[in-house]
């Protein structure tokens, strides 16, 4: 067998199938941007479904790939077993209605056994097949020459996920020898059994049947091939190492962790070995996932990353690593993978920043959290229970950042379990509290009263019209049906046809009026009713509104005009953020009103001033290019193929609304927009801030609001210039001149203060007392700040040569205290840090420092004299 690196095996696989006429499909992003319902790409075939289900016809029906994948269903087993991983690479070859069973088997055998390729000893290979797959048996036995005793028939060799394509599969196993198992009485010691000797190398799936709704199977008109070979497992066999972690795909990370920790891998400590493995696995996953745009958070795929990082940090403590360090492994992962995934090294600085940020956040609470958990476990044992309550588990999650799964691992080590149901109950209570705290949401009490019973149809026509003739089809007051609303009364109603947009997708509702003969009704707000209709919150200003009344519904066009400008601007902003900051940026929330827009997005660290300037300029350039905004209805799959941005967690129907701004922005959106970007006029960023870990917020204005903002700023500039007696264009020069003047005055002030301090220090020497043979000076002085206090202290120590000195000053009801001890007295046991702490405690403060100099603060100026009197007592206590 050849000596090969993991990178060489990957490339060899792709080269082999390229020679067999396959197109090499690039590895897709781990984050399935085209399918927000899917958490991660979790297999080689996941990105090829569009070919297998016929939505897209591939240019070449023969495809091969090396697909990075993430699976997180067995996180707790990572590190415990030889081959469990959260991140792995799946090598595969696929046929979309082209070749079938014979070619798939023949090529697999050639790749594994030919000296040109892997070069396995044929005698060490066995295969499993489905008991009824005689075709596969014949190919293996007669054409490949595998003796029948090494062809094992297993019932589970059938790939079936319910209705749809299915078929038998064959798996190829490699015999690693008696060192990995020689107990032939073991019922699992066979290819396909649970053992370490016979390792599965390759799985070939023959998709030849359709599983029908009635449970029957019928032959497919076009048969497909879907194969999978785990690179990590294959590499462990080729490199003849006991586990996947001992291959060159993992050892560089383990080696770097050895250097950081000072501990050794495989040094006889199984617990430490597990820690090395957990860290190596999890940093690969996090590095690739962040590189593909995922960021740690408290939900979805972000929660998975947070859980992995915090699990790795927890295990790092077993290696005596008590500081953020995982970020240092990011470039190591990049070096290992650079041949096939150069993007990791290209993004290493950003990835490392994200990882370090998350590590630092967890380290801030980890120690306290572990202490609390230890108390919880001890208390549970005292109470003779083996269950950690959901309340305690939630407190660890909410206050100390412990993912529930991490608490469960700690509990398992202590022989305990966690009340998962109780934890979920606490989570739901928190969600309820959050919902109740949102005063601006559900203010209409949409769910109240009879609204859930209303099933009448209501059509929204507001995309294309601002006024329409309508009929009131439901009228509600105080949660109950009513026949009428009088002047001054508030209620809720539904129209059979409405131009009023209901608040959703971050866009606020339309306002406007309903008009009829003698009737004028103000529409204050519009929300979605429980059954999906637009529900109008109204106040009758004139006349009486009755159920079934015919009205003219007219929206406030001035308000709508401002809203649509801001909404289209958020789409331009979203894309500009991706262009400037990176593709990891994703929308995390938005608010679109007539006055302003607010856009929340995933990003670590403050957006720098020059970046904000670039973002703002890009948005304005797109506005000034006068780009048409096209809105269309598309099948969801077609929209995804077009590359439309979809929001993770959003539920989309089969047909979606696509908003396209030229070739610049493409999003799925149900909101209202301008027809052309020129209508926006101008875009101005007002503020950028952080609203949580990994989430930033930009607030901006457009159109008239942007003009008014800039006009106000120009007005302030003119006012400031007037006060400085200069022109606006010269104001910076004038400010620089003023700063220079202030700096000169500060220097003169400091010089004067130093002279005064020197004079006062000279006067203070007359107040020196001798206590047990030690010069002692404790005095309240009149200086402006701690810097002047230090200057005075230095003067006094120089003048006195041998002394214990304590000075205190009072400014704005705050006490500054400074203690100094000359070198000769330090050796006798006098300590400025200890002394100043005692003095400060007597006037409501605290502090400390070095033996020769220490400072403190106090809160009670009235007690300063009393505090200074303690200095003599201190000197006496030391001299004894």
Swiss-Prot record:
Keywords: Aminoacyl-tRNA synthetase, ATP-binding, Cytoplasm, Ligase, Metal-binding, Nucleotide-binding, Protein biosynthesis, RNA-binding, tRNA-binding, Zinc. This is Alanine--tRNA ligase. Pfam families: DHHA1, tRNA-synt_2c, tRNA_SAD. InterPro entries: aa-tRNA-synth_II/BPL/LPL, Ala-tRNA-lgiase_IIc, Ala-tRNA-ligase_IIc_anticod-bd, Ala-tRNA-synth_IIc_core, Ala-tRNA-synth_IIc_N, Ala-tRNA_ligase, Ala_tRNA_ligase_euk/bac, DHHA1_dom. NCBIfam families: alaS. Binds 1 zinc ion per subunit. The keyword Aminoacyl-tRNA synthetase applies. Catalyzes the attachment of alanine to tRNA(Ala) in a two-step reaction: alanine is first activated by ATP to form Ala-AMP and then transferred to the acceptor end of tRNA(Ala). Also edits incorrectly charged Ser-tRNA(Ala) and Gly-tRNA(Ala) via its editing domain. It is an enzyme of class 6 (ligase). One of its GO terms (molecular function) is transferase activity. It comes from the Bacteria. Coiled coil: none annotated. It catalyses: tRNA(Ala) + L-alanine + ATP = L-alanyl-tRNA(Ala) + AMP + diphosphate. Its cofactor is Zn(2+). It is found in: Cytoplasm. GO terms for biological process: alanyl-tRNA aminoacylation. Its EC number is 6.1.1.7.
